[in-house]
Amino acid sequence: MATTKSVLVLFFMILATTSSTCATLGEMVTVLSIDGGGIKGIIPATILEFLEGQLQEVDNNKDARLADYFDVIGGTSTGGLLTAMITTPNENNRPFAAAKDIVPFYFEHGPHIFNSSGSIFGPMYDGKYFLQVLQEKLGETRVHQALTEVAISSFDIKTNKPVIFTKSNLAKSPELDAKMYDICYSTAAAPTYFPPHYFVTHTSNGDKYEFNLVDGAVATVGDPALLSLSVATKLAQVDPKFASIKSLNYKQMLLLSLGTGTNSEFDKTYTAEEAAKWGPLRWILAIQQMTNAASSYMTDYYLSTVFQARHSQNNYLRVQENALTGTTTEMDDASEANMELLVQVGEKLLKKPVSKDSPETYEEALKRFAKLLSDRKKLRANKASY
């Protein structure tokens, strides 16, 4: 929780100098953030498939990809996996996975990743298949090769510090130019579920640099939206592409934050009487659930408040299902029946209103975002041609 607070303080310190000068659409910094949640990544994957389809329709281009429209794509845990899939280049320097390929990936590999390969004295899953499939899909690609700026979090249990993998930090910290498959496994290595991940890179002097990493949710508590915005803010200050942005304000931000769902109000909640009888192990399991839920709500609360205060509420969209029940609440239930339910959750979510105070549905809001993203991309391209 202290790490989340530090990121929040850093973010608001950077933005404290923002001007009120309204920028043109072409100068917007566009950010996509994807939560962690294991197999529940199927929910944001379903949303991304819809959004990419809308971008293809708006631009009349079946080859349009999300990485073409977002300046920063950030994720933690399963969100980090999605980030890598849509930003890692293939042999043609295009994203190796379209958004429509992500859900089939979960269906094909989820049951093997979340199998019963662990032991009673260790993590529930040994992670061997997971790492193998990541190596096969992502190859030797490193951070610097990502097709847009990325922000993938993990936590080093040896240094007791968060590790943020971004392209913009490589000049200062070349040891962060790790292989994408190492990063993806690390950000998803949730304690008790998968073993921590050890790998080595090299510093600018050629010295070995060791990583001992676990799930990025330990660093960002599941929702990387603040982290992604902090990276975007820093990027806008150093990237020549954003030279015309003198001082970033909220009218120059477009943030899409995708959740993996939270439990319904009375599902998996507890009373003080129940909790009074718990031992340490029971508390560990409950605290993880409570912390993730609290972080998701509070991060959205912070961002909604700030964007609204700056009269830029239409520039921020949080897509989240808050009424998961039954098996859909589990991050490791990769049965075909449950994965089908998660797809349905994502599809039904598109038809729901963004808030109780707004008649706009998530589907309508995403169509609006697709138009904004398309317009911004075209304006920036036109500006570059002069």
From Swiss-Prot:
The nitrogen atoms of the two glycine residues in the GGXR motif define the oxyanion hole, and stabilize the oxyanion that forms during the nucleophilic attack by the catalytic serine during substrate cleavage. The keyword Lipid metabolism applies. A motif (GXSXG) lies at residues 75-79. The gene is pat2-k3. It comes from Solanum tuberosum. GO terms for molecular function: monoacylglycerol lipase activity; nutrient reservoir activity; phospholipase activity. One of its GO terms (biological process) is defense response. Residues 1-23 form the signal peptide. One of its GO terms (cellular component) is vacuole. Probable lipolytic acyl hydrolase (LAH), an activity which is thought to be involved in the response of tubers to pathogens. It is found in: Vacuole. It is an enzyme of class 3 (hydrolase). Residues 32-229 form the PNPLA domain. A motif (GXGXXG) lies at residues 36-41. Glycans are attached at residue 115. Patatin have a dual role as a somatic storage protein and as an enzyme involved in host resistance. Its EC number is 3.1.1.-. The active site is at residues 77, 215. The keyword Hydrolase applies. This is Patatin-2-Kuras 3. It comes from the Eukaryota. InterPro entries: Acyl_Trfase/lysoPLipase (IPR016035), PNPLA_dom (IPR002641). Belongs to the patatin family. Pfam families: Patatin. Residues 321-384 form a coiled coil. Keywords: Coiled coil, Glycoprotein, Hydrolase, Lipid degradation, Lipid metabolism, Plant defense, Signal, Storage protein, Vacuole. A motif (DGA/G) lies at residues 215-217. Tuber.
